[in-house]
């Protein structure tokens, strides 16, 4: 059975050896964080490297390929400066849906406001509406049905942020 903590610990040690002091952050996102992972789930890891280059991306791929269950690897890698300049609309959701393993994510992102969270919800609702209308017209019923789990996931993310706005409490799981 796949053990996420062991995977993350191994990955962390390998990345520290490769990037040295340039490794700023490693975090867990997705179904393993929410306790919803199945046998088929991938593991969503967020990595931040100072002054990231294309070579660093190649090194990251090389490291992942050395790990057991490398085919489960998924996630996001970025540079420290790029993250500091990230769109504030996404920061509340990012911070609340990522568990720190190495470094502290909240210290690496721009500040966000209630306005940003509301704008994120509004943008997400608009994108969801667009997707649903598009699929209704241009996709078969069978394909629409197969896409429902992804739609549910989008709705859940929207509801997380609405609940946060109304209560100040960010619910991490369904």
Segments (PLM) and residue ranges:
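Short gly/ser-rich loop at a beta-strand->alpha-helix junction or flexible surface loop bordering the NTP-binding
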Residues: 23-32
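A general structural signal for short secondary-structure boundary/capping elements
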Residues: 73-76, 89-96, 122-123, 141
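Short acidic, glycine/Ser/Thr-rich loop/turn "cap" segments at secondary-structure junctions
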Residues: 75-80, 106-110, 139
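Ordered, amphipathic secondary-structure segments that act as subunit-interaction surfaces
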Residues: 85-107
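Conserved nucleotidyltransferase catalytic core and NTase-mimicking acidic/glycine-rich helix/loop elements
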Residues: 111-174
């Amino acid at each position: 059975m796949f053990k996420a903590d062991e995977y993350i610990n191994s990955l962390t040690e390998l990345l520290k050896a490769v990037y040295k002091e340039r490794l700023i952050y490693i975090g867990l996102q997705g179904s393993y964080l929410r306790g919803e992972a199945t046998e088929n789930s991938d593991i969503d890891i967020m990595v931040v490297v100072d002054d990231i280059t294309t070579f660093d991306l190649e090194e990251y791929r090389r490291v992942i390929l050395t790990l057991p269950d490398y085919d489960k690897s998924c996630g996001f890698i970025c540079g420290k400066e790029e993250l500091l300049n990230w769109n504030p609309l996404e920061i509340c959701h990012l911070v609340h849906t990522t568990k720190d393993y190495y470094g502290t994510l909240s210290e690496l992102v721009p500040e966000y406001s209630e306005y940003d969270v509301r704008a994120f919800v509004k943008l997400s609702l608009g994108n969801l509406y667009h997707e649903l209308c598009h699929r209704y017209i241009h996709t078969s019923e069978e394909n629409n049905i197969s896409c429902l789990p992804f739609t549910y996931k989008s709705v859940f993310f929207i509801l997380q942020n609405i609940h946060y706005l109304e209560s100040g409490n960010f619910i991490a799981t369904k």
